[in-house]
Amino acid sequence: MSVLIICEKPSVAKTVALALGAAEQKDGYLSGDGLLVSWCIGHLISMADAGSYDERYKKWRYEELPILPQTWKYAPTPGKEKQLAILKELLHRSDVSEVVNGCDAGREGELIFRFVYEQAGCTKPFSRLWISSMEDSAIREGFAGRRAGTEYDALYQSALCRARADWLVGINATRLFSVLYHKTLNVGRVLSPTLNLLVERDGKITMFHKEKYHIVHIGCGGVDAESERISDAAAADTLRTTCEASQAVCCLLYTSDAADE
């Protein structure tokens, strides 16, 4: 029987395969020593477009908003159909007894694998290869200590929530603002706040005016201090005069070994 490992990228799959002794190159995967090592190319499965839910959603109309799917649909990512077909065939091979999620150790890696596994209709047991190093020793150790895939169900659900939230915000908000302003305006959960940061920063640069300010410096035998920026020259001079007429007092002494820092 064989174990199928699915990695997130071809380069990672090759590194994992060579570390585990699967060096024979096939079409879309590597094999050897009882292992089949294949790969995704990022997301092979994506959230289906709104038009796939109902014909009326193929046109952008204000009256059809919001679009809130009750049952979610998925579709192959354009241009990646061949590798998806290879993975589906491997997942259903009779000699494959176990599937290993070898995608990147993180939320998105979990989603990339689960989408393929579930859309392929695979029911074989699957485990998780969770590694952050591409050293041969780390790969072999991670493979030997792989854990049941179900232990990462919460991570998968988190990734699924993120993907669906992106879809809901992106599809509905993009259509809404595009219809209202009569031109395509892309809106997204990450895109829009990021764009806002750039707009705010650009506005600050545009509205920036040079201002004079004053800082009062105090030197006390090697223990120096300084005030915040003071825009009023008279206030800064008053602070300087007050400090010159005063005596500095040590309120706290703290010592430490250099090794502790």
Predicted segments with their positions:
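Intrinsically disordered, low-complexity regulatory segments
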Residues: 1-163, 167
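Long, highly charged, low-complexity internal segments
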Residues: 45-77, 89, 185-256
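Generic structural signal of hydrophobic/aromatic residues within well-ordered alpha-helices
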Residues: 87, 139, 165, 177, ...
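C-terminal or mid-to-C-terminal helical accessory/interaction module adjacent to the motor/catalytic core
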Residues: 139-218
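A short, hydrophobic C-terminal helix/tail in secreted or cell-surface proteins
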Residues: 257-261
